[in-house]
From Swiss-Prot:
This is SsrA-binding protein. It comes from the Bacteria. The keyword tRNA-binding does not apply. It holds the Pfam family SmpB. The keyword Ribonucleoprotein does not apply. GO terms for molecular function: RNA binding. Belongs to the SmpB family. NCBIfam families: PRK05422.1, smpB. InterPro entries: SmpB, SsrA-bd_prot, SsrA-bd_prot_CS. HAMAP family: SmpB. Gene3D superfamilies: 2.40.280.10. GO terms for cellular component: cytosol. Required for rescue of stalled ribosomes mediated by trans-translation. Binds to transfer-messenger RNA (tmRNA), required for stable association of tmRNA with ribosomes. tmRNA and SmpB together mimic tRNA shape, replacing the anticodon stem-loop with SmpB. tmRNA is encoded by the ssrA gene; the 2 termini fold to resemble tRNA(Ala) and it encodes a 'tag peptide', a short internal open reading frame. During trans-translation Ala-aminoacylated tmRNA acts like a tRNA, entering the A-site of stalled ribosomes, displacing the stalled mRNA.
Length: 159
């Protein structure tokens, strides 16, 4: 018997940015590496990370993650001054940076982080080109989601 082995390694999610999926229409997704310090990796392993109000900016032909909060562990704060909200450089190909920068400049889209996950032994961030939702669009999405839940609930109870 041949066992089918998955070619794709398991991605363990560290943090999700649920607010981004609520506030934006996701156009296209990219995976980027992060430049981190040692204490930041330890904090990520401990799950002390938050992406809620973070976004991506472009400076000098590079992409930077702004506003991601990595809380330092108590023992790190004793030895050094840790900045939990410092800007972190994203590792992307030039072609990807050009595509993202062009879409932000020409189409008025924005780049937001969706999640932080482990890929093998590296921390990766999934970023997305996104278009902002209007308030009525958000309400419509909520109504549609509630209707789907109600429909499944009724079908489950009768079927």
């Amino acid at each position: 018997m041949n066992k089918q082995i998955s070619k794709k390694p398991a991605q363990r999610t560290i943090a999700l940015n649920k607010k981004a999926l609520h506030d934006y229409y996701v156009e296209q997704r990219f995976e980027a590496g992060l430049v981190l310090e040692g204490w930041e990796v330890k904090s990520i392993r401990a799950g002390r990370v938050q992406l809620r109000d973070s976004y991506v900016v472009f400076k000098g032909g590079e992409a930077w993650l702004i506003g991601a909060h990595l809380s330092p562990l108590p023992n790190v704060a004793e030895y050094m001054k840790a900045d939990p909200q410092r800007s972190r450089k994203l590792l992307l190909n030039k072609r990807e940076i050009g595509k993202l920068f062009g879409a932000v400049q020409k189409q008025g889209l924005t780049v937001v982080p969706l999640d932080l996950h482990w890929h093998k032994n590296h921390v990766k961030v999934e970023i997305a080109l996104a278009k902002g939702k209007k308030t009525h669009d958000k309400r419509e999405t909520i109504k549609r989601r509630e209707w789907e839940r109600e429909k499944h609930r009724v079908l489950k109870s009768h079927g």
